[in-house]
């Protein structure tokens, strides 16, 4: 039998790290497992200006502070550690981690967040990693003094486009509608930036190039006229999809693939809780994920106490 923990948290984004902070501070033996780096989607943000009590900083900085807090209180954190199997039913729940084996726990918190939504085009797949990216923080520096495209019209798309002007010589924002879905002040900030240009009501037709991206071809929704945009990089910011495929057939989901929970973050399986962007909800912010992680941790502590007391759970 592998090492036993009180609670295993799947995911080291803001929800998972917050849960880890609360659990470990309560002397609950906790393991956090993540297939990537700590921070989740949060690390993709250049500037975070709306996190209460914190001056404008990067998502990376916030994630590292959260990670240090969790570890300081005694939480074990395993990153770059894909989960290869799990059993979430019954009293003995376990998670199998690549190259590490099985870890057992009395309760599980699912906090695997979301993954960037793709356009679903063959040419998009061809240039992933050779010009096409979904993370400005990760890859922006590679495009210093180059012309790039940013696809999307929401808050993240415009905020990240502004951030990319620190590196790129020109950023062309391509959006499928005539109006942005971003908040007005974010749109105004983008419009005031001399490096940013706009192409509205456009369909993405194709990405072209040889061994790396060279052009983005778009077409007007109104006239069908095509425009070829020279670009060595293209950042796609069209939202996220819940990272819940590993829970399919195990936990109840809605038609969007989001986990269904109650207010206490209980899922359809006793002893399994969910927190963050993978669950069914309207608003997704760092702060809402932190709130979810807090509630999930406290609910999980209640669950462990009820088990110890022999109360129904």
Predicted regions and their residues:
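Beta1-alpha1 glycine-rich phosphate/pyrophosphate-binding loop at the start
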Residues: 5-75, 152, 158-183, 254
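FAD-binding core/adjacent interface of flavoenzyme oxidoreductases
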Residues: 1-10, 26, 31, 44, ...
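Glycine/Thr-rich phosphate-binding loops of Rossmann-like dinucleotide-binding domains
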Residues: 118-119, 158-159, 181, 226, ...
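A Rossmann-like FAD-binding core segment of flavoenzymes
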Residues: 70-97, 102-105, 166-263, 302-313
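FAD-site-proximal beta/loop scaffold in flavoenzymes
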Residues: 120, 126-142, 238-288, 292-295, ...
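Short, glycine/serine-rich, charged loops/turns that create anion-binding
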Residues: 37, 116, 155, 178, ...
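Short amphipathic alpha-helical segments
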Residues: 20-21, 44, 120-123, 161-163, ...
């Amino acid at each position: 039998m592998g090492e036993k923990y009180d609670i295993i948290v799947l995911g080291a984004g803001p929800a998972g790290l917050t849960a880890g902070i609360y659990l470990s501070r309560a002397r609950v033996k906790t393991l956090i497992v993540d297939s990537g780096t700590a921070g989740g989607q949060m690390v993709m943000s250049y500037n975070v200006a709306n996190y209460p009590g914190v001056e404008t900083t990067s998502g990376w900085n916030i994630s590292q502070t959260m990670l240090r807090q969790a570890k300081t209180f005694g939480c074990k954190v395993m990153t770059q550690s894909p989960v290869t199997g799990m059993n979430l039913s019954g009293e003995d729940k376990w998670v199998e981690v690549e190259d590490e084996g099985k870890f057992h726990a009395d309760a599980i918190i699912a906090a695997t967040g979301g993954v960037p939504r793709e356009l679903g085009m063959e040419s998009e797949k061809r240039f992933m990693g050779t010009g096409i990216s979904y993370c400005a923080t990760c890859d922006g520096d590679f495009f210093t003094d180059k012309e790039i495209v940013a696809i999307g019209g929401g808050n993240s798309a415009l905020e990240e486009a502004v951030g990319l002007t620190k590196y790129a010589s020109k950023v062309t924002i391509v959006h499928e509608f005539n109006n942005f879905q971003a908040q007005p002040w974010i749109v105004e900030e983008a419009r005031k930036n001399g490096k940013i240009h706009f192409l509205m009501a456009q369909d993405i037709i194709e990405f072209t190039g040889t061994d790396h991206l060279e052009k983005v071809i778009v077409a007007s929704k109104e006239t069908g006229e095509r425009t070829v945009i020279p670009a060595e990089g293209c950042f796609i910011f069209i939202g996220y999809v819940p990272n819940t495929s590993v829970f399919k057939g195990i936990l109840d989901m809605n038609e969007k693939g989001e986990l269904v929970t109650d207010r206490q973050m209980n899922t359809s399986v006793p002893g399994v809780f969910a927190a963050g962007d993978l669950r069914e909800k309207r608003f997704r912010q760092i702060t809402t994920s932190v709130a979810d992680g807090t509630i999930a941790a406290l609910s999980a502590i209640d669950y462990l106490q009820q088990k110890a007391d022999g109360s129904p759970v």
